[in-house]
C-alpha cells in the first residue's frame, strides 16, 4: 500500500509527458515540412536566377525595357500628382463644407434665440394689453364716482339754498351804515361757491394721483409675482425630476436590499449546510477515532496473545526433547498459523505434522518463515514448477459441544534428502521469538499430563495417517491466569477439535503414501491463552518422508482484526519469494468482534460444512478479559519476536538455491470461531443482543465484500463467506451441499494439477510491512492476491466447485492485471488506471522474477449490498449440487496430462473461467503466474521481461482509447446498451443450434497449437472471465471497461433465477471456448495471427447472431477442417462492416499486428479504425502486451455492464440483425461469399497479416477503401 502510494504520482506525470512529446513531435513535423518547402522554393528561385543570368538579352531590348520602365515611372508620377491634386481639392471642399456647416449652425442658433425672444415679447405685449384694459376700466369707474360726487354736491347746494330761503328774516338793529346792495351779495356767494368747488376739485385731483400711484405699484407687484411664478414653476419641474430620480433610486436600493437579503439567506443556508457537513464529518471522525481506539485495544490484546504464544513455545522448546533418529538438515519447513485475534483467553487447538522434532538447539534448515500480520499475510516463498493439489481429509463433525472448531492442517510433501543445510537457519531456530515446534510425541519423551478426552489420537504420531482428531477441553475460568509452567492442572470444559489432515503431492502419492500426523497437547494451547489454528508446510526428502520426524516449525500469529489467514509457500530455484497474502478485513469487523469478544479467525480456505458450528450464538457471549499488566509484559517480547521473524525471512532469502522444492497445495484450513469462555457475568442481555446484531451485520458485510469484490475468492474468500453468513439457514444449506461433494473432492483432489504459479515478491518488503502493521496499523492492509490465486489453483477441489457455483449465480467479475482496487467504494478510473500503469512500469524495471502484484482491498460498510449477498448465498445452495458433477469431471480430466489446456477443453475452460473471474475484483490476475507455469511445461524462448513490456504497452493502448470509447458509447446507445433477456435467449438458442463438429475442431486445435507455440498459452484462460462477465447481457469480450459485481447483480435482480441459470449454463462453455480460441492467437506466434483475428471476429459476431463460431464451440477436436469457412465468414463480414466500426471498438485487434514495426500510413485509416487498432501508440503494443489483452479493468469508469466495450453490439449493421434474430439466412449468405472469397482472394483470409503482408493489412485496416 505504501509502496504503491510512492509510485502513484508517476502515472499522471507519465501521461502528461507522453502527450507533450506527441505535441512536440507534431510541431517538429510541421516545422520540418515548412523548412523543406522553403528549401525547395529557394532552389527553384536559384535555378531561375541562374537561367536569367545565363541568357543575356540584346542591348536594344534592354534600352526599350528601360524606356518602358521610365515611361511607366513617369505615368506613375503623373498619376500620383493627379491624385495629390484631387486630394487637395477634396480637403478644400471638406474645409468649406465644415465652414458652411458651422455658419449654418450659428444661423440656426440665432434663429432659435430670436424665436425665443419673439415669444417672450409677445407674452409681454399681451400682459401690457391686459394692464391697459384694466386701467381703462379703472378710469371709467373713477369718472362714475366723480359724477356721483358732483350730483351729491349739487343736491346739497340746492338743499342749502332752499333752507336759506325758508329761514325768517331777523330784524336787525339799525346799522349806522346802510346795508349792502344785492349784487354785492351775489358776488360774494359766487366767490364762495367757486372757492368750495376749487377745494373739491383739488381733493379729487389728489385722490386720482393717489390711485394712479397705487395702480403703478400694483403693476410692479404683478410683474414681480409673475417672475416669481415662473421661477416657482422651474423649481417645481426640477423638484419633480429630483423626485422621479429619487423614486428610481429608492426602487433600485430596495431591489439591491432584497438581493442582499436573498444572498445573505443563501449564504446562511450554505454555511448551515457546511456546518451540517462538518458536524457529520466530526461524527464520522469521532466514530473512526472510537474504532481506532477499539482497534488499539484489540492490538494490545493481540500483543498479549503473541507474548503468551512466545511463552508457550519457549516452554515447549524447553520441556520437549529431540525425537528424531538422525538429524534432518535436508528438510525445510514453512509454517504459518492462525491466531484468533482478540482471544487471549480462548481455546487453543494446536496441530502438528510429524516429520522431525527438535529443541531450540537443534539444527533446522528452514527455507521459509512467514509472518501473518494484521490483515496481511506475507509469505516469502516461491512456488515450484510442479504445482499440485493436496487432498484434505474431512474430520468428523461434532455437534455435542457448544464451541467447536475444525482446523484443517495440511502438510507439504517431503523434500529431497540431498538438500544442503544452511547454518544460518540453525541459528534462527535458536532465536527466542514466536515459535511453535511441531514436536511429535514419543513414548520415551516426557509429556504434560493430558486427560483422555483432551487428546484422543495421541499415540498415533508415528503412523502415516491422513488426519488426527484432537479433542481438548480447557477450563474457562483458568485460561487467563494459568502461567506457562502450569500445563496439566486445568479442567477442560469447552471442546475444540483440530485435525492435521495432510495433502499428498500427486507426484509422490505412489511412493509416499500418507504423511505422519502428530498431536499437540491442548495444555500447551491453554498456556498460550490464545486460540490458534496452525498448519505447516513440511518440505522433507522423498526417501526420508516416513522415517524422519518433522523439524521445528516457526509459527507466527495472524494479528488481524476479524478473519485472518496465513499460509506459507516454498521457495523456488530462482530464489524469488512469493509475498502475496493479503487478508481481507475491515475495521468495522475488528471493532465488532472486539466488543462481543468473539474471534472469527476462520481461515479463508475451508469447507462450508463448518458454518453450522461457526455461527453458534454461544460464540457471541465470549469476552476476552486479559489484564493490561500481562499486555505490558508481553509487548516487548512480541516486538522482538516479529523483528526476529523479519530477520529470519531476509536471511532465508539468501540461502542456497540448489534445493529443488516442490510447491504443495495450499491448505484449506477452516478455523471456526475460537470461542473463548471467560467471565461473561457482567454482560447484560441487552448488550448480548446488541453485539449479536453487530456481529451479524459485520459478517454480512464481509460476505458482501467477498461476493461483490471477488465472485469466487480463491478458497479463502469462500471460507470467509461461509464463516460470515449471518443466517444459520444459509449456512446449513451450504454445509449440506458441501458435505455431499466432500467425498468426491477427497477422491479427485490429487488429480487436479495447478494452473498457475504465484508471483514472486521481495520478502524484505513483506516483512517490513508486516512488522509495521502487526502492532500499530488499524487500517485495512493490502492483500497480496497472488498466493490466494496460487492456493486457488492448487487448493481443494472445492475451489472449482465454488467457482462454478458463483459463476452460475452470475457474480461475474472482469479481470484486472497489476491493478489496485481503491480503498473507497467507487474508485476513480484514472487513479486506478494510473496505479495499474505504475505497477506495469515497476514490473518492467524490476527483475522478471520479482514481479509482485499488489492490490488494495477494503471491505467498507456496504449495507446496500446485503441483499445481493443473501441472493448469492441462496443461489449458491441451489446450484451447488448441479455443479459438483461437472467439477469432478473436470478434475478427472486434468489428471492425465499436465497441460490443462489440451483435454476436455470445454469443462476445463469453464473451471478456469471461474478461476479467473473470481480474481477480478479482489486481486490482480497475474499473467506472470500462468506464464511461469507454462514456461516449465512447454519449452519457450519468450522472456518475462518482454511480457512485462507487453503489459505496460497494452495498458497504455487501452487507456488512450477510453475517451473515444466514452463518446462512442453515448452516440451508439441503441447498438450497445441493454439487450434484453429475450434477445439473449433467442441468440443463445440459435448459437447452440449449430453442429458440434466445428466447435470441437476449433476449440481443440486452437489450444493445442497455443500450447506448442506460445509460452503464454495459459493466459488464454485469464480472459475467460471477460466472456463470462459479458455473457448474461450479451456483451462478450469486455476489454477496456469492467463492471463490479454489485452492478451486475443489481442488473439481474429483477430477472428470475431460472432464466439466469439457463442463460449462464448455455453461455459458459461457449464463452470460455471463444475466449480460449481468441487468446490462443493472442499468445501465439505470428503464424497464428490470422486465426486469432478471425477468432476475435467470431467472438464479435457471436452476439450479433452472425458468426457460427459460438454456435460450434461445444466439442474440441477438428478445427483445421472448419477454420477456413469460419474465417471466410468473418472476412466477408468485415469487408462490409469494417467502415462502420466506431472508435469505441478498442484493443482486441491490436495484438494482430504482432510483428508490424511501422505506423499505419493513412490518416483516414486512423480516423476510421484508429482506436480499434490503437495506432496512437505502436502497433506492436498488443504483440508485446498480449498477456494483458483484456485486463484494462477500471472499476470506476464502467458503472454499467451494458456500457462495457463489447464486440458485436458495436457493429451497427450486425447489431440490428442480432436484434431481429435473422442469423441463419445471413450465415448462409456469408458461406456463399466465403467460398467466393477463398477462390478469389485467399490471401485476405487473414484480418491482419504478418510481416510479409503489411500492405494488405493496411488495406484491411483502412476498410478496403
UniProtKB/Swiss-Prot annotation:
Q: Does the keyword Coiled coil apply?
A: yes
Q: Where is this region: Linker 1?
A: 53-64
Q: Which BP terms from GO are recorded?
A: brain development; cranial nerve development; embryonic camera-type eye development; negative regulation of apoptotic process; positive regulation of intermediate filament depolymerization; positive regulation of neural precursor cell proliferation
Q: Where is this region: Head?
A: 1-16
Q: Where is the composition biased (Low complexity)?
A: 943-956
Q: Boundaries of each IF rod domain copy?
A: 17-324
Which keywords annotate this record?
Answer: Coiled coil, Developmental protein, Intermediate filament, Neurogenesis
Specify where the region named Disordered lies, as residue ranges: 383-521, 667-830, 863-1073, 1093-1116, 1232-1265
Where is the segment annotated Coil 1B?
65-160
Bias type Polar residues, positions: 383-402, 422-441, 479-496, 901-910, 1015-1043, 1105-1116, 1242-1251
GO MF terms here are: CCR5 chemokine receptor binding; intermediate filament binding
Coil 1A: annotated span: 17-52
In which residue ranges is the amino acid composition biased (Basic and acidic residues)?
403-418, 444-459, 784-796, 803-819, 863-897, 911-935, 1061-1070
Residue ranges, annotated region (Coil 2A): 184-203
> By its UniProt entry, which SMART domains does this protein fall under?
Filament
* Region entry Linker 2, spans: 204-206
Q: What is this protein called?
A: Nestin
Organism, as annotated: Danio rerio
Source organism phylogeny: Eukaryota, Metazoa, Chordata, Craniata, Vertebrata
